Amino acid sequence: MKKIILGLFLILGTLSFASPSFVDVNKIKQNSYEIRDDEDDFFTFVKSTDEAGISVAFNVIEDTNSKEVSEMIKSIAPDSQKFLSSINNKRAYVNKFADNENGGFTYNFVPKTEKIKNCYISVLYVTDSELSSTELDNAVNKILNEVESYLK
């Protein structure tokens, strides 16, 4: 199920040979992620664990902010993903979706502050079960700490 959801959210393109200069590709690969898109302004990687499917995108977008990126992702979710709510979190804008076709939940989080100017991180965290507030806060912090460590 997790791989199906990740596939729905990802736009698969051809890989280029030059990774963005702000990304530590070796560190990403060492942590068992699979790189999907490797372009200067759009870089994505995915991983499936026992607890969740994780899809991460680094998007270089000018003239926007984190809240707008979060709203944009919410607006382009597939029809199979029913938007449930926006969740208050200290560190990120979080949107919660239910999968109408396969069950489970998808949480999208976009950090409120950028580590690199105009580089916005978007994480899709796909689980079979609904997360409590504490579990969600822990997931947001754990994943964002890891993902932000991949930025140079």
Q: Where do the language-model regions lie?
A:
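N-terminal "mature-domain start" segment
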Residues: A18-F45, I143-E148
